[in-house]
Amino acid sequence: MEYNKLYFNNELSMCRFTYIYMRGPFGRYTTSITPKGERIGHIWISRSIDLNEDMLEELMVHEMIHHYVQTIDGVSFDGLFQHGRHFVRQIKRIKKRYGLVIWVCCPHWHFRNEKPKYSLSSKVIGYLRNNLHLF
């Protein structure tokens, strides 16, 4: 995959990919363990949001960072919502080396046919996650 080569030096193993309707998160990463003990990653992308090319790249790389943390770093629990120290380290590396900004959450995105809602609490949570990397 192009992003694996560009951002992860082709270190990532293949993982499953599903494009599915999800009302909650825009993307999700899960793993399963094979009978041989191998960890298999699965990236889920929501089709309930209109993604342009830049958004898709950001979302895919975000989920690939989860894949990296679990399969390369070998860390199965990385802080609250899996956006801890190992995840943030990869965000900073990618931003510094390639200029790509990966958000922990994307408060500026919204679902199809839904007007964006920017409550004070969502702005505060977005700031704490993205700027301070608290969770």
Please identify what each model-predicted range represents.
Residues 1-54, 71-135:
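Metalloprotease/metallohydrolase-associated module, dominated by Zn2+-dependent proteases
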Residues 58-71:
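Active-site recognition of the HExxH zinc-binding catalytic motif
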